Amino acid sequence: MNRSSFDLLSTVEYGGCSAKLDPAKLSELLHDIPLPVDSRIMVDVSTHDDAGVYRLNDDTALIVTTDFFPPVCSDPYTFGRIAAANALSDVYAMGGRPLLVLNLTMFPSEGIPVEVLADILRGGQQTIDESGAFTMGGHTIDDPIPKYGLAVTGIVHPEHLVTNAGVRAGQCLVLTKPLGIGVAMAAHRLGLIGSEVYEAAIGQMCLLNRAGAELMQKYGIRGATDITGFGLLGHAKGLAEASDVCLHIDSRSVPVLPECLSLLRDGCIPGAAFRNLRFVGDMLRADCPTEYKMLLADAQTSGGLLMAVDADRAEDLVADLHRTGLHPFAAIIGYATDAEDAAKLIVT
């Protein structure tokens, strides 16, 4: 079947997870919204986790989440794949298995061929099929800027749930995918990188976090998150606050896409990075070159999992991630200690 050649990037200024609302503003506006109270709710928005969790019985809990955004790449089919992988990632980050999805679509009734929407949905369905989940329908509204994503329901055993609050002092931090997605996509739009770097970024965004989620269960991991629009620092902030620990990150151990550090040194810094640095604020104590700090704040789309694993098993976990053939960039990037003061993110 022929695919559309329409350039989706011509419709947007900000795409992917860089289009998220400023996290500081989001926290402020949600402050006075009352939280539901029920003994069966295991995870709500108070801990800034990747999804909500509701206990059905002693053996099964439901994971519910949603994510959608404007195009992050030119090709409609690829955009569908990336958006679906990004939405499914929240379930994987909680240690679960996606079960059911609904398509969430915004698309103009005029100006863009309807075949473009068909390609987006086909791309999304490819990724959904890879996850083993089932599409149960969806909802589409008329909007001048295309947007696509999923509402996802997953399942997990209540005793195997992975949350922001599960990190313990003494554990090591493992990251499964390289950083630099935001930098690479901005550089692509400016014509600053070649096809090799661009395709590497696309490949990482299309990659499901399924293998990482399965290994989290093998290693008994209970503290993790995925790295998306708030950057590694923003999502690490959620782990540190919910677990009441200090996270120490070795910036030079963090995996990074080719050329992205040199791009940052040359001033190719997406605006979302500055927004994310404001969000972490005084929690961050950084003693590293500026390009590394900006890398850690770079907004990722469909990024990797940041896991906290017992120190004596960290190298084995990384080796298992490498053996999957899907996560060659996986690396130990730091460790957790007891929190002693306001600085809960120490970067060297």
Swiss-Prot record:
One of its GO terms (cellular component) is cytoplasm. The record marks 20 as: Important for catalytic activity. The active site is at residue 17. Its EC number is 2.7.9.3. GO terms for biological process: selenocysteine biosynthetic process. It comes from the Bacteria. One of its GO terms (molecular function) is selenide, water dikinase activity. It catalyses: hydrogenselenide + ATP + H2O = selenophosphate + AMP + phosphate + 2 H(+). InterPro entries: PurM-like_C_dom (IPR010918), PurM-like_C_sf (IPR036676), PurM-like_N (IPR016188), PurM-like_N_sf (IPR036921), SelD_I (IPR023061), SPS/SelD (IPR004536). Mg(2+) binds at residues 50, 90, 226. Belongs to the selenophosphate synthase 1 family. Class I subfamily. Synthesizes selenophosphate from selenide and ATP. Homodimer. This is Selenide, water dikinase. It comes from Porphyromonas gingivalis (strain ATCC BAA-308 / W83). The gene is selD.
